[in-house]
Amino acid sequence: MRRLLLELKIAGINFPLVTAALSLALVLFAALAGELLDFAPIAFEVVFPLYAAIAVGEWARFRSDAAFEAIAAQSPARFPWMLWRFFAVFAAVSLLAFATMLAAACIRPGLALEEMLLLYLPTAFFLASVAALVGGLSPQEHLPTLVCGLLWLVALLTRSLLRLPGVEYVYPFLRFAGDQHGVWLWSKAALAGIGLLLWAALGLLAEKPPKAGPAFTTPLHKPDRKSVV
């Protein structure tokens, strides 16, 4: 528990403030939106998973952390540290997402809490795992957010690909796009499995020692013997 609190403290004050603001905005949206709006897929399959990925990319920094070299030198293994930092940020976002679900269920009695959880958790875990993998491989700041944002946007713009066989099983926003064959639970299970595979890849690559660069021990210009006194 102390480790989680320490990681959240490192994340800074902006993280809980922005997350709480998003939760409040979605609660207001649930109260003001009409009854014909399918609120659960929009809020918990599309919006909150994207924010979970952004939070991991921006506040659970791995190689882009300024202290990464010191942490890597002092830690016996890098992967457990990455896992703790990811879990701290992802769990905090998920707790506020759950609080938003409870508030939305009170405002809109037709919403099912179990359905909202199943819409959110696998999708958010998949996108956040993509952000974690990119952050664990690249020291470039904001690159995980960029990659996840592009993936999110491309997925929304390519809903027509659902006509192809098999695409619906890996499409991250199937309920939002329209589940024609009732396979959205299988789709969420596939997303969770892909997220675990991404973490397995990160675990293998995180502990891989960096490749040694070329040696520069030989001087570029040999000193002139005549100039040596």
Regions found by a protein language model. Give the residues of each.
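Transmembrane helix segments
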Residues: 141-180
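A cytosolic-side transmembrane-helix exit/cap motif
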Residues: 60-70, 134-138, 163-172
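Secretory targeting signals
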Residues: 24-61, 83-148
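Hydrophobic alpha-helical transmembrane segments
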Residues: 1-45, 50-62, 125, 136, ...
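Positions in alpha-helical segments
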Residues: 6, 66-69, 116, 132
